[in-house]
Amino acid sequence: VTTPATNPNKALWEKGDFTQVAASMRESGEALVRAIGVSPGLKVLDLGCGDGTTALPSAQLGADVLGVDIARNLVEAGNRRAAAAGLKNLRFQEGDASDLSPLENGSFDLVVSIFGAMFAPKPFDVAREMVRVTRRGGRIVMGNWIPGDPTLVAQILKISAAYTPPPPEGFISPVTWGVEANVKERFGAAGVAEGDIRCERDTYTFHFAGTPPQFVDTFRRFYGPTMNAFDAAEKNGKADALRQELEALFTAQNQSTEAGRTKIPATFLRVTVSVR
């Protein structure tokens, strides 16, 4: 897989330590892998895999899994998790979702990207590469946050954007992957018929062993986009306003009935592509 040294996303996802946020995503990751239908012997590519929230449970179900991520620290963390779990059928490597060479054409039964490839630049290249490495008769499954959605992550990104400088000209927002028409256009350009693309809304729940303000602090300290928002907000004296806005959001959306715990469901677009 080509070196991602020039990818502007690399610094963003190597900033902080996304594993600290990913810890709140494990339970839903396992449930999603089961719902997708991962089975023994399946060759799976997990794209934008982080430290293995869906890659590790896929391997535990008996699939042969390769995790690819732009961030070296997350790849290293994933390989440590695989070793600790004794999983010989799971490995992680650095790579760019928009250029998966030298992965061979049609080499995977299933390509999974849950809140991963949506953050890569060049979305048409990303779609083309996912289709290219999937065998005929195989599937691609994406999970993408939805722009303007009232639930957690879309609102974190929306609030954060209000505190950060405007993106460079030509920037394509990651949440454009959460719009069905865009999904169909991008995979259509990669040669997929519209009837082979299915989009449905699904729910991903975050489970955090702490209060909503403590969960906000985890995002502030470890999640690249939120860290950047606070860096920018601190420069113009608005960091406290950003913190208060995020704490209000997390507190309002917390559904946990246990004191000192946080449980927040977030809506996403689940995309299933059949490759023929």
Where are these regions (language model features)?
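C-terminal helical/coil "lid" or tail adjacent to the Rossmann-like core of SAM-dependent
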Residues: 4-14, 197-258
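A structural alpha-helix within SAM-dependent methyltransferase catalytic domains
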Residues: 33, 56-59, 79, 124-131, ...
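A short SAM/SAH-binding and catalytic strip from SAM-dependent methyltransferases
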Residues: 109-124, 146
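Class I SAM-dependent methyltransferase SAM/SAH-binding core
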Residues: 43-100, 125
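Conserved class I S-adenosyl-L-methionine
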Residues: 1-42, 53, 77, 85, ...
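Core SAM-dependent methyltransferase catalytic element
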Residues: 190-192, 264-276
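A short acidic, Gly/Pro-enriched loop at the edge of an enzyme's catalytic core
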Residues: 98-110
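Conserved catalytic/acceptor-binding region of the Class I
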Residues: 124, 131, 135, 139-210, ...
